[in-house]
Amino acid sequence: YTMAYFGEDLRPYWNKDGKTSIEDLYADAEEDYKEVMAKCYAFDRQLMADAYLAGGKEYAELCALAYRQSVSAFQMSEDSEGELLYFTPQVGPVDEYYPASPLYLRYNPDLVKAMLNPFFYYSESGKWGKPFPPHDLGGYPAVNGQTIGGDMPVEEAGNGLIMTAAIAKMEKNASYAEKHWKTLTQWAEYLLENGTDTGDQLTTDNFAGNCPHHTNLSAKGILGIAAYARLAEMLNKKEEAEKYMD
């Protein structure tokens, strides 16, 4: 098993059905080596070409480093309901997934969903019980709930809403948001009440301690509210769209 997930032992994704041995994996790797490596080289060339056009040689080299560092930091699994899960060893925090998300939004938005799925589950199962997302869900190898301590209500609610809206934009539909609409609405309501003046809250720079009336945090909250309004608009929820966009 790779991780304990709210009482369920998860297998690594390559052996999610429990029927694949490491010897089978080695055999498949040998058989598919040439085909897989050709795809890898083609992807590398495309990534470098896109990054070079966007910002030149140095930017492209930074993108290559960032891609490898980000992808190697995650591991993938699947729960008993077939829900894809994408974890870092700290299992969150959302404010670390947020800056990584543009990479996955471009190449595979399903992996951004897989980052958010555990947070939606934790909120919707009743295990969390707060009107904003948890900061984290535990640490490897146990995903049992927030352990780091110190909620980041505006930070994480804003991140969750913005990431969900970004998924909808990339997929050109809001079906993922619709699936979690009740939870997203709860987060948006929290931001509407607390997002413009954030009081005395932690931000992603939590080493600095609480930051009263933090301007950047307010901006995150406002963008989260706007993200919810855009999702409501995509789902033809006109009243909600007008309320949160105004």
Q: Across the structure, where does each feature detected by a protein language model lie?
A:
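Carbohydrate-active enzyme catalytic cores, enriched for enzymes
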Residues: 232-246
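Aromatic-rich carbohydrate-recognition surfaces in CAZymes
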Residues: 14-37, 89-198, 214-232
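Accessory structured domains or lobes within enzymes
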Residues: 58-62, 66-68, 197-200, 216, ...
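Short linear capping/connector segments at secondary-structure termini
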Residues: 202-209
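C-terminal ends of transmembrane alpha-helices
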Residues: 72-79, 193-201
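Acidic/polar, glycine-enriched structural segments that form the non-catalytic walls/loops
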Residues: 1-92
